[in-house]
């Protein structure tokens, strides 16, 4: 278990000014979990993850790994503790003049040459590149380089793997393959994985729980499904919208598209299905039941933490009292209703 309590880490911008990269952050990550920490650039997420293995030593606070206070360890004890915390980065950090085998073998100590070769081959098989041991980094694709980095991070059989923007330099297809590999490793090895990213798609794809950071603080945390389906903080809502086709409505409004020009009395709203049990044809039913027109402008369905999350942007047309009853009907069905534009009541 990873337990961070009241972590503070500052950097001096100049003589008289310091910046709180991490400001009073507390976080608990359970064994075997895949936990995401997401935030825009400068939010403090990379500094926070480096506090876990004390690559960045906090100014104050507590860092406990499986009940052991990392801040109080002596240098030799800290070195030993770090061998059980693997880490991968955006830029892979491979040594270009060494083969894949030599790169992966680098952290291994106290083993014979044959034992090292056997261990490296086992790791390369685990990350699905068993035929690359004699290749050099320049001969590998970005995805293959990250697989080598993962193999090296696993060399000492760690319990924890820290991933700092590990897919940011990869194309979407390769990103998906690396995320699937991390999920497989979590299942096979029982690894606790901490994922640092600015991409909500990554969190949605791999994480079970997540925390959202902004200006050095955690502004929202919990189950990924709850964060996606019912974000509470404006920053979180912005992140969620970047992953949904429903966010295109803002572009259509900004461009004054004829698709979204409302007539007097019309209401444009975003409907978000926040529970997995919504299966009725609710648009057509509400249209008939309340005798109003409901026109679908955009629609989207996503799988988040194994659960379907759907949404639509619609325009209601009809008597105001009936529109309001229809929106209340949706709320009663556990559908979140967000009014985007309201053309007012017809005189």
Predicted regions: what is each one?
Residues 53:
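Helix-to-loop junction immediately C-terminal to a conserved catalytic motif
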Residues 203-205:
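A short, surface-exposed alpha-helical micro-motif characterized by mixed small hydrophobic
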Residues 68-69, 114-131:
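Conserved ABC ATPase "signature" region
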Residues 70-86, 110-113, 117, 227-231:
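ABC ATPase NBD coupling module
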Residues 98-105:
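Short coil-to-helix segment of the ABC ATPase nucleotide-binding domain corresponding to the Q-loop/switch region
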Residues 135-138, 156, 163:
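Conserved signature/switch motifs of ABC ATPase nucleotide-binding domains
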């Amino acid at each position: 278990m990873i337990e961070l309590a009241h972590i503070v880490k500052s950097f001096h911008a100049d003589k008289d000014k310091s910046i709180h990269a991490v400001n009073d952050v507390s976080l608990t990550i359970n064994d075997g979990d895949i936990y995401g920490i997401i935030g825009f650039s400068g939010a403090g997420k990379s500094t926070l993850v480096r506090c876990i293995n004390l690559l960045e030593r906090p100014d104050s606070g507590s860092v406990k790994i499986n009940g052991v206070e990392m801040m109080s360890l002596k240098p030799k004890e800290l070195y030993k503790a770090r061998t059980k915390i693997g880490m991968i980065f955006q830029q892979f950090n491979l040594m270009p003049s060494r083969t894949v085998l030599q790169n992966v073998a680098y952290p291994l100590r106290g083993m014979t040459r044959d034992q090292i070769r056997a261990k490296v081959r086992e790791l390369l098989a685990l990350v699905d590149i068993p035929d690359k041991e004699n290749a050099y980094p320049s001969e590998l694709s970005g995805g293959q380089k990250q697989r080598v980095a993962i193999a090296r991070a696993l060399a000492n059989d760690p319990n924890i793997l820290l991933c700092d923007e590990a897919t940011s330099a990869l194309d979407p297809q390769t990103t998906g393959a690396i995320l699937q590999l991390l999920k497989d490793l979590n299942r096979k090895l029982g690894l606790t994985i901490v994922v640092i990213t600015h991409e909500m798609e990554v969190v949605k794809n791999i994480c079970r729980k997540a925390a959202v950071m902004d200006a050095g603080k955690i502004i929202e945390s919990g189950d990924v499904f709850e964060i996606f389906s019912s974000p509470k903080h404006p920053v979180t809502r912005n992140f969620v919208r970047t992953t949904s086709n429903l966010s295109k409505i803002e572009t259509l409004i900004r461009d004054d598209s004829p698709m979204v020009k409302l007539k007097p009395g019309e209401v444009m709203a975003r409907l978000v299905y926040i529970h997995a049990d919504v299966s009725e044809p609710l648009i057509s039913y509400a249209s008939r039941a309340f005798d109003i027109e409901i026109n679908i402008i955009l629609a989207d369905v996503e799988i988040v933490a194994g659960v379907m999350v759907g949404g639509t942007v619609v325009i209601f047309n009809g008597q105001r009292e009936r529109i309001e009853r229809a929106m209340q009907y949706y709320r009663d069905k556990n559908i979140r209703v967000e009014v985007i534009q309201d053309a007012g009541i017809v005189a």
